Design a protein with these regions (language model features):
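S-adenosyl-L-methionine-dependent methyltransferase catalytic core, i.e., the SAM/SAH-binding region
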Residues: 1-44, 53, 64-315
């Protein structure tokens, strides 16, 4: 099961979809956003055609790709869309610029990124994303290559492991956690992690929060999630047409900080540039500045509680 998209209507509305536009969904997953984009394109086409009833077309318009959907997990292709306007891209969104160049796309009208991890990954024990199961400690989004979370624990130094826990899990006790895991080597499963930390049976809320942060840190490091996000944002900025929009859903403070600063400044450093007269120079006009889901939506979809929507329009 893939997660129910948070703020779906608000996100799609934020893209301001044009019927003849070209769009990118860099986090295809279950395909919820991609299907909504294609539906909105079709609605726009029907609206245009109904308004030009007297125009006689000499030939049928050629169908072209209008939506490119990325996912580095090949299992997502099981949710493929039967639509000639749609193209699946099996790859990490950090390579957005490379893939668009390959497809001959030089500019786009919009891009959406839902940075949440799918229920699909948490609920499949063998993926190793959740401490609810005693399973191989994998955590790779793309299982066709790369290092696993077990590889990190078994090969990183104590300082390196502590850095990961402190930076990506924001854990104040990162050092002792790293030490206990290293002392328990070799670590192969999620259960090994719990046993190394002296956790068994029912987990109390404090330890559960600690484990959640620790597993988040390992997942971010294994997949270089923040590095990939930074590269994707730069590529999106360069590909967007004037008037084109980028919509990003974030779920934790680390990724939200990166997106917020980038949309405000247009650069990864978050430095606001000004002209000679002191006017702010930025490639984006902010449309949504961290919108949260409504109480009604959170009641239906508790996962939406931590979601924040940010939308920027290229100027």
């Amino acid at each position: 099961m893939y997660h129910i998209p948070a703020m779906l209507e608000e996100t799609i509305a934020g893209l301001n979809i044009k019927p003849d536009g070209v769009y990118v969904d860099v986090t295809f997953g279950g395909g919820g956003h991609s299907r909504a984009i294609l539906d909105r394109i079709a609605e726009g086409v029907r609206s245009q055609e109904s308004g030009i009833r007297t125009k006689i077309r000499s030939q049928k318009s050629e169908v072209r790709t209008q939506l490119y959907s990325f996912d580095q997990d090949i299992e997502a292709y099981g949710n493929a869309i039967d639509d000639a306007r749609w193209q699946f891209v099996h790859g990490n969104f950090r390579y957005l610029a490379n893939f668009m160049d390959y497809f001959g796309v030089t500019e786009i009208d919009g891009l959406i990124a839902d940075l949440g991890v799918s229920f699909h990954h948490f609920d499949e024990a063998e993926r190793g994303f959740s401490f609810r199961f005693d399973a191989p400690l994998d955590m790779r989004m793309n299982r066709q290559g790369g290092r696993t979370a077990a590889d990190l624990i078994n090969n990183y130094s104590e300082d390196e492991l502590a850095r990961v826990f402190a930076l990506y899990g924001e854990l104040k006790n990162a050092k002792p956690l790293a030490r206990r895991l290293i002392q328990a080597r070799p670590v192969a499963t999620t259960g090994d992690v719990l046993r190394a930390l002296g956790i068994s049976g029912e987990i109390d809320p404090r330890r559960k929060k600690e484990l959640t942060c620790l597993f988040q840190a390992l997942r971010i490091e294994v997949n270089d999630e923040l590095g990939a996000l930074r590269e994707m944002l730069v590529a999106a900025r360069d590909l967007l047409k004037p008037g084109g929009r980028i919509a990003v859903l974030t779920y934790h403070s680390l990724e939200d900080r990166i997106v917020k600063n980038f949309l405000r400044s247009g650069n990864l450093e978050g430095e606001i540039q000004k002209d000679f007269y002191g006017n702010i120079l930025t490639p984006f006009r902010l449309i949504e500045k961290g919108r949260s889901a409504s109480e009604e939506e959170v009641a239906r979809n508790p996962r939406a509680r931590s979601a924040k929507l940010r939308v920027g329009e290229k100027v």
